[in-house]
């Protein structure tokens, strides 16, 4: 993938950039792997806003991704690399020997025609999926499970990868995540070899507000320009200070620097080294 710089034909396009989609080999998705989805605009079942600054956006179909990779011992051929509007990574269309089709996250270096496998005794090759206990130390991995059989939850964004540092015992392995956090993960969990593709996604510049609206984002208004009944920073004559010793969230809680990690969380015992540890 390469980054396209647009000509400054307007102020909105002056610093805009995008992908050339050179890796994409198929433009129309597999119909049997599509699910319709409706946008909720950040509302819950009661109609209350639970996530601010969401709404609108282009209509999208959800691509059903195989995060479990549990068809062991069966070869799957990569038939296409496709764009997925629901995530930053590209996806790969697989055709299994028994005729089943599925999507997986497209790892860096995976090409059309390659064969990928899942199972215990598969090769340490990009795109293959196996249990962490069968992966050598130092291997780059992605698409990592946290609970056996639940499906991958970690290292799924474009360009992201983790590294398997070692095996402490038969039950746990030590993995260094992209954030720098080092944590223990059950050795029975599966992971996929390699890093997620589309690694230059982070270099794309949105360029203009309208392009963000296409993605389903609405404007973010500063609290200091609101009324005092809408935000703790609001009110005052003209451009006034926030009136608090620390910045506040819209709900009156300290923010911008306040620690939000619960050190009594059950997952704390699995963290060997925090991401902000010096």
Curated annotation (Swiss-Prot):
Subunit structure, interactors included: Part of the 50S ribosomal subunit. Forms a bridge to the 30S subunit in the 70S ribosome.
GO CC list: large ribosomal subunit
Top-level taxon of origin: Bacteria
Basic residues bias: start-end ranges: 255-264
rRNA-binding among keywords: yes
HAMAP family found in the cross-reference section: Ribosomal_uL2_B
Molecular functions (GO terms): rRNA binding; structural constituent of ribosome; transferase activity
UniProt record similarity statement: Belongs to the universal ribosomal protein uL2 family.
Name of the protein in question: Large ribosomal subunit protein uL2
Function recorded in the entry: One of the primary rRNA binding proteins. Required for association of the 30S and 50S subunits to form the 70S ribosome, for tRNA binding and peptide bond formation. It has been suggested to have peptidyltransferase activity; this is somewhat controversial. Makes several contacts with the 16S rRNA in the 70S ribosome.
Family annotation (InterPro entries): NA-bd_OB-fold, Rib_uL2_dom2, Ribosomal_uL2, Ribosomal_uL2_bac/org-type, Ribosomal_uL2_C, Ribosomal_uL2_CS, Ribosomal_uL2_dom3, Ribosomal_uL2_RNA-bd_dom
SUPFAM superfamilies: Nucleic acid-binding proteins (SSF50249), Translation proteins SH3-like domain (SSF50104)
Keywords on record: Ribonucleoprotein, Ribosomal protein, RNA-binding, rRNA-binding
GO process terms (BP): cytoplasmic translation
Region (Disordered): 223-278
Family matches, as PANTHER family: LARGE RIBOSOMAL SUBUNIT PROTEIN UL2M, RIBOSOMAL PROTEIN L2
Organism per entry: Lacticaseibacillus paracasei (strain ATCC 334 / BCRC 17002 / CCUG 31169 / CIP 107868 / KCTC 3260 / NRRL B-441)
């Amino acid at each position: 993938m390469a980054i396209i710089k647009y000509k400054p034909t307007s102020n909105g396009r002056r610093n805009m950039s995008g992908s050339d989609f050179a890796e994409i080999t198929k433009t129309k998705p597999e119909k049997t792997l599509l699910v319709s989805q409706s946008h909720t605009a950040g509302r819950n079942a009661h109609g209350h806003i639970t996530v601010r600054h969401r709404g609108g956006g282009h209509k999208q179909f959800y691509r059903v991704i195989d995060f479990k990779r549990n068809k062991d011992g069966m070869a799957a051929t990569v038939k296409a690399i496709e764009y997925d509007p629901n995530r930053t990574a590209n996806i790969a269309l697989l055709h299994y020997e028994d005729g089943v089709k599925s999507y997986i996250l497209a790892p860096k270096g995976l090409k059309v025609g390659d064969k990928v496998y899942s199972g215990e005794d598969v090769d340490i090759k990009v795109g293959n999926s196996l249990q962490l206990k069968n992966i050598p130390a130092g291997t780059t991995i992605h698409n990592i499970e946290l609970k056996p059989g639940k499906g991958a939850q970690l290292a799924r964004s474009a360009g992201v990868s983790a590294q398997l540092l070692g095996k402490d015992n038969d039950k746990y392995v030590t993995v260094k995540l992209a954030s720098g956090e080092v944590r223990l993960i059950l050795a029975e969990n599966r992971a996929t070899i390699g890093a997620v593709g589309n690694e230059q996604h982070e270099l794309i510049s949105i360029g203009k507000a309208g392009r963000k609206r296409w993605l389903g984002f609405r404007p973010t208004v500063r609290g200091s320009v609101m009324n005092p009944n809408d935000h703790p920073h609001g009110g005052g004559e003209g451009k006034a200070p926030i009136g608090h010793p620390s910045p506040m969230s819209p709900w009156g809680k300290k923010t911008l620097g306040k620690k939000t990690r619960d050190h009594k969380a059950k997952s704390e015992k699995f963290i060997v080294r925090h991401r902000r540890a010096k």
